[in-house]
A protein has these predicted regions:
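N-terminal loops that bind phosphate or other acidic moieties
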Residues: 7, 16, 21-156, 160-357
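Short hydrophobic alpha-helical segments enriched in small aliphatic residues
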Residues: 3-5, 10
Length: 357
């Protein structure tokens, strides 16, 4: 028996006695299919032709929108809904994921910052980083700690904030206070009031926690390439606000050295998400990592690809931007390492997608 399918001069086949192993890791088709739904559809198609094939489907995401859904669905976790403080101070319902390790029963929380402090939660006419806070992100972390999580994967894209992560740290028990010892207010306005930082009331379990922060930008906290200058305008900052916020974050960074002498506002990525990169690196046990690399590591995709006969990946739109580090390229790079053939599926393919080859 010999069944063959050809695509772009690539042949995948099945002969008597040979059991083909196909690894499928495909990003979501936004608005249509989640990562796992797309992967299962491809798996079903493969099995229709090669009944004896072993098809392994793994979730895929780049650390941004859809990462919680992809990892929770793909790794047998649960979704948790929690009411938290939104970016404007009003309550919002946010969802995060919890995955329990089958090896040692440890729990990992998967959190997207945008669920609690995202730009989509703020009407366009209300976007103003002097007012918006990351407090709700800290509340999600606290809730996960109370549920036994000590490992965290946090995606920090899509934020509405420029508070240096101060709101998140306030929720975790750090006291950011005025000259009179009162708690500062939310957002950039609160940074105007900041006189000192105290750590006596930090949640005791925070020191036991590790954070992998999905960060794919290299901007420092301050300066012409910093958080306020590069990302502030898209969050509603006027040129005057940008200048003031930059100075306020500089003051915050200097005060932070009293808590952590190694606080480094120049470190690449500290300017990510309005300074959340700086907050995580300075105040928690965190690393800033490529979003796709975090996902590939957590799903142990490399081990699967190493023993695969064929690899399938893709996303909603395959174009020149895909080649610049989006999720399917991470999969393709692993496949190339082990000299595996790769097929990509997409909802749309543009002419410049040839850059992916």
């Amino acid at each position: 028996k010999h069944v063959s399918v050809c695509y772009n001069n690539v042949s995948i086949y099945e002969k008597g006695g040979f059991k083909m192993k196909v690894v499928v890791a495909i990003d979501s088709f936004k608005g249509s299919l989640s990562s796992m739904e797309a992967g299962q559809a491809i798996a079903e198609g493969v099995k229709r032709v090669y009944q004896s094939a072993e098809v392994v489907v793994r979730p895929l995401a780049d650390g941004g929108e859809g990462t919680v859904e992809a990892l929770v669905e793909g790794m047998g976790g649960i979704f948790v809904t929690k009411e938290v403080t939104g970016p404007l101070g009003a309550k919002v319902e946010a969802v995060y994921g919890v995955i329990e390790s089958k090896e040692d029963s440890s729990k990992t929380a998967i959190i997207e910052m945008s669920a609690a402090a995202g730009i989509t939660l703020v009407p366009e006419e209300s976007r103003n980083p002097m007012n918006t806070t990351t407090y709700g992100v800290g509340e999600l972390i606290l809730d996960a700690i109370e549920k036994g999580c000590r490992h965290f994967i946090v995606g920090i894209g899509g934020s509405a904030t420029n508070d240096g992560g101060v709101g998140m740290l306030q929720a975790l028990g750090y006291d950011f206070v005025t000259q009179e010892g009162k708690a500062i207010s939310y957002g950039g306005n609160g940074l105007r009031e900041l006189a000192r930082i105290e750590e006596a009331n930090v949640h005791p379990s925070l020191k036991e926690c590790t954070f992998k922060v999905a960060c794919d930008v290299t901007n420092p906290l301050c300066g012409e390439n910093g958080s306020s200058a590069i990302f502030g305008p898209q969050k509603g900052a006027t040129p005057e606000m940008v200048q003031e916020l930059d100075q306020l974050l500089l003051h915050y960074a200097e005060l932070s050295k009293e808590i952590n002498a190694n606080a480094d506002r120049f470190y690449p990525g500290t300017g990510a998400a309005g300074g959340m990169g700086f907050a995580f690196l300075t105040y928690t046990n965190a690393t800033l990592e490529s979003g796709i690399q975090i996902v590939l590591t957590e799903t142990k995709l490399e081990e699967l690809i190493a023993t695969a006969d064929f690899v399938v990946t893709g996303e909603g739109r395959l174009d020149g931007q895909t080649a610049l580090g989006k999720a399917p390229i991470g999969v393709a790079a692993l496949a190339k390492k082990y000299q595996k053939k790769v097929l990509a599926f997409a909802g749309a393919v543009t002419p410049d997608a040839k850059e992916c080859n």
